[in-house]
Amino acid sequence: MLKLHGFSVSNYYNMVKLALLEKGLPFEEVTFYGGQAPQALEVSPRGKVPVLETEHGFLSETSVILDYIEQTQSGKALLPADPFEQAKVRELLKEIELYIELPARTCYAESFFGMSVEPLIKEKARADLLAGFATLKRNGRFAPYVAGEQLTLADLMFCFSVDLANAVGKKVLSIDFLADFPQAKALLQLMGENPHMARIMADKEASMPAFMEMIRSGKR
């Protein structure tokens, strides 16, 4: 059985978790916060989450894990059959990660954990996020899903990145990135109605106290 190592507060962990649930695959969840301790680095070379444990060993990096699951496991397809359309899904996924998720992450400390972020970092995040959302508007199809009519891997990155980025915009940057992006708002609502999302969000809520205690203590 596949084992998913990580924790339910992590958006990247939840992307993989949603893929496994959508495909109807059995899997075991293993709490793992990563870090630089030797035992953590044996599981994840960079000490990051998530990690997928397979019969052949451990895999890190979310996009790699998602591709591995899609290539090796049965169940609902999360990539189209056509090679070009597959590439478009991966293109959208990578654009959302590079130009929305990662810039927003630079302000997570202030947005979600009550810490301060340097003004220059916030200025760069604002510019990068404006460009990132403009990119998504140009390239996303939203029919109603990011890449078209079917749920794909791009939607997993979308639903666990765009909501956080918009929260950063409102709380830290004084901007609503979705104010003129009704298609993205509609897709977030649609994804929120997915029954698997209810489980994921409940697990996230239940895990939050332990996660916050870990943050306060500085221990992993």
From Swiss-Prot:
Domain GST N-terminal, first and last residues per copy: 1-77
Catalytically driven reaction(s): RX + glutathione = an S-substituted glutathione + a halide anion + H(+)
Keywords: Cytoplasm, Transferase
GST C-terminal domain mapped to chain residues: 82-211
GO cellular component, one term: cytoplasm
Pfam families linked: GST_C, GST_N_3
Domain of life: Bacteria
Subunit composition and interactions: Monomer and homodimer.
Family classification: Belongs to the GST superfamily.
Record's function text: Conjugation of reduced glutathione to a wide number of exogenous and endogenous hydrophobic electrophiles.
Protein name: Glutathione S-transferase
The organism of origin for this protein: Pseudomonas putida (strain ATCC 700007 / DSM 6899 / JCM 31910 / BCRC 17059 / LMG 24140 / F1)
Higher taxonomy: Bacteria, Pseudomonadati, Pseudomonadota, Gammaproteobacteria, Pseudomonadales
